[in-house]
Design a protein with these regions (language model features):
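N-terminal active-site segment of His-dependent metallophosphoesterases
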Residues: 1-57, 73-74
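Charged helix-capping and loop-helix junction motifs
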Residues: 19, 47-51, 122-127, 160-169
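Extended active-site neighborhood of metal-dependent phosphoesterases/phosphodiesterases
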Residues: 49-128, 136, 173-175, 206, ...
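Conserved beta-sheet core of the metallophosphoesterase superfamily
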Residues: 159-234
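Short acidic, glycine-rich surface-loop motifs adjacent to enzyme active sites
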Residues: 138-155
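Active-site environment of divalent metal-dependent phosphoester hydrolases
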Residues: 11-13, 41-46, 68-76, 113-117, ...
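Active-site neighborhood of phospho(di)ester-bond hydrolases with catalytic His/Asp-centered motifs
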Residues: 4-6, 33-38, 62-68, 109, ...
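A short C-terminal boundary segment appended to hydrolase-like catalytic domains
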Residues: 232-253
Length: 253
């Protein structure tokens, strides 16, 4: 199974949540860790360093993608001309692939310097990921990681304004070649939606849009505690929430 973290927002982290995640990894057979963006609060060197140290402490293979908080906000020169310099100093490539016993994980950079919060998936990215999905082992679950969700329900205050430009086009193309799910953060609210049913994609299996809450930050939304997702090799998605009394992450009943 994989541990799906998001919106760590180092610079606003809670040590008790970090410790509880470390304990969880020690106690469970985690194949890999996914961190779906917003690793930092303000893209500072110290924040990237702290995030890197934390992910390394989990002692599991991991894959990360940038979020909108991972490029400079106030330093306009850096935002325009070198938005990912600090990110790449600690995490190298913006887009990676990680293969485990049961999963084939593809990272996609949906962050653009011209947008404050909204994502964007280019035609080149759509084609590249499509080729990767076609080449992926058929016996593994194929998951694509991007920071912004590809779907928000009609009553969501963010609406479609934060969903990536060309996200629907990407979804329709990737679902033709075995996509099982998309992993996101951004909204700080855990959820899972079957896009095969919502959009009538015609896939032979569910295509999940899986949202993670914030795992370690005090920047909580909707009065929800810190949380993360666990996804097993049957594509069963479980949400775990931080219990302030037990100081552990516990599965939602």
């Amino acid at each position: 199974m994989i541990l799906h973290l998001s919106d760590l927002h180092f610079g606003t982290e809670k040590p008790e949540c970090m410790w509880a995640i470390q304990q969880f990894c020690q106690q469970h057979q985690i194949e890999a860790v996914v961190a779906s963006g917003d690793l930092t609060q303000r893209a500072r060197y110290a924040q990237f360093f702290a995030c890197k140290q934390f992910l390394e402490s989990l002692k599991r293979p991991y894959i990360v993608v940038p979020g909108n908080h991972d490029i400079p906000l106030y330093h306009l020169w850096n935002r325009v001309f070198s938005p990912f310099t600090r990110y790449k100093l600690f995490f190298d490539n913006l887009e990676n692939v990680l293969e485990t016993e049961h999963f084939y994980l593809v990272g996609v950079n949906s962050i653009r310097r011209r947008y404050h919060t909204r994502g964007h998936i280019s035609l080149e990215q759509i084609q590249r990921v499509d080729e990767q999905l076609k080449a992926a082992p058929k016996n593994k679950l194929k998951l694509v990681i991007a920071h912004q969700p590809f779907y928000t329900p009609p009553n969501d205050p963010h609406g479609v304004k934060d969903c990536p430009v060309q996200g629907r086009l990407a979804l329709e193309q990737w679902s033709k070649h075995g996509l099982n799910g998309l992993l996101h953060g951004h909204l700080h609210v855990p959820a899972a939606y079957d896009l095969n049913q919502i959009y009538q994609l015609g896939a032979a299996h569910p295509v999940w849009d899986i949202h993670a809450g914030t795992a370690t930050s005090y920047r909580l939304h909707d009065n929800l505690p810190n949380s993360f997702n666990v996804i097993d090799h049957h594509m069963d998605v479980r949400h775990y929430f931080f219990n302030a009394v037990s100081q552990q992450f516990e599965q939602k009943p």
